């Protein structure tokens, strides 16, 4: 009898065969081994049986990791082992987290840890969809109050046709990279980048992915049933309804009034004062029954319901706007003298200082993946310091949120960047959020577009971004343009759209409730289009196309072509020649096998100096031309004279003077500089020189 109680489920998901398995590996956790095509991911879920005392939030942690052995590789670095999570791993962790988090009920505070490990990969496709499906299956058998399962799908668009779960080869031809996740009845999460696609094309991709994932959801349900998954016995905590009614009677009107204060810090101060008043009124001095915690919860719930009721009843939003109005905008470019490109983009109380820096190919980011090492010529780094929201905090490396927001902003800009052969600079954008009250990632998109044009980067089109929100109760709903931080926190959807006047370049959607219909998504997309066009119009008043020249402080780029046979002369023995040129001119030089030479100089003069040295090395000797040469060796029958780097010719004794000489050393000595004329170059490349009738300096 086997020591393993293995449960398997196989199903076809688009072009890939999927196998779910449990009971063989990591049996002390709720574990699923999922194989999808050539990718295998081990997903382990561990849930604490009870919440920690005093816990007032849901501690869900998702860690996605790629083991290098999965692709038959040994990690780099001194220790030769996997280190901290890469940016790609962090982004995939967020991708898994976002659709499962809203499916746990309010009040469930038991700690849950999800670990998804890629253990095998044929390097033909991403492992994220397999990891998401594996997580869904592991949660389905974990006995937690998870209202799943979820399905997930990647959607591409090739030649106008949607493609389900495309591989790397197909993605290279696709105009769209969209990941959608959801339940049987609703879409929960969308993450995408696109090449300026229409709203209809994007909505169609979301609906296509949701329809196709139903087979995965059905298979996971059948898998969980076969594994004997038991329903959770967790019961939601009851709340003091009498206290809720008293709080509402005493504070609903006051909270509603506080939410008419437009300035965020003043509004927060007023709400904090009301909360303190509620605590003083309803919490006894000796709080043995935990009334303080109940007041905290019910007060937050009252704030939530008050703002939502105001919006749905048609009242002005927190800052006095209607549902479609974008906050006041201020657009400035060229705000930093030495930066290659800079912009200060302000939208209400959200502000981003965005810079563009241009570098040479050696500044490219080296990215280590399961498929191997690749170079990335475009970087966008997003920073969210504590001071941007008027708080103190410890400065550290980028957190998951910053990495995620930076990637979203990058997606919004990438589609409009020029091709590398047209603009071969490495581009680094940094967005420093200096103020924040909602939609800082979309402010980063706007600022990035502005700073790129200020730097002289020839964009295909300017881009802008806007964050949309939703409040929905029953059949009533309101879509909000350009949401505040409070509206994001108190709303049901965070819907971010970036794009140009021609179409969408990035779409991100996170939905906290079920029941978001096609109609609501269509309304949100169309309303976002109107908002995006308004923002673009305001940006275009300041700058609408790239400056004609790059910044005088940016490196100068030049391209020349040399004879491929001369490449080794430019490089020199052991790289000595090219290294000397680089050190002398401070220019970076890249040479391709076809003879294309790219020169990046810190200044235009540096680039020109490097090119002059390269051309001197690679120049072809011209018969009849006079050269400045140096005697490098004297022999009995003449002298060898260097006329160009790496090029020597023979000056025969009979060609040294118009008069007959007996000894070469009577006229010449080694190291002497002379003017010589090329008489002839034979078919073997040997050069004959003369000094006759050539006036010497």
Curated annotation (Swiss-Prot):
Binding site residues for Mg(2+): 488, 494
Limits of the KH domain: 555-614
Cellular component terms per the entry's GO annotation: cytosol
Gene3D superfamilies cross-referenced by the UniProt entry: GHMP Kinase, N-terminal domain (3.30.230.70), K Homology domain, type 1 (3.30.1370.10), Nucleic acid-binding proteins (2.40.50.140)
The enzyme's E.C. designation: 2.7.7.8
Coiled-coil ranges from the UniProt annotation: none
Major site of localization recorded for this protein: cytoplasm
Subcellular compartments: Cytoplasm
Keywords assigned by UniProt, alphabetized: Cytoplasm, Magnesium, Metal-binding, Nucleotidyltransferase, RNA-binding, Transferase
PANTHER family assigned: POLYRIBONUCLEOTIDE NUCLEOTIDYLTRANSFERASE, POLYRIBONUCLEOTIDE NUCLEOTIDYLTRANSFERASE 1, MITOCHONDRIAL
Function: Involved in mRNA degradation. Catalyzes the phosphorolysis of single-stranded polyribonucleotides processively in the 3'- to 5'-direction.
Protein name: Polyribonucleotide nucleotidyltransferase
Organism classification: Bacteria, Pseudomonadati, Pseudomonadota, Gammaproteobacteria, Moraxellales
Gene from which this protein is expressed: pnp
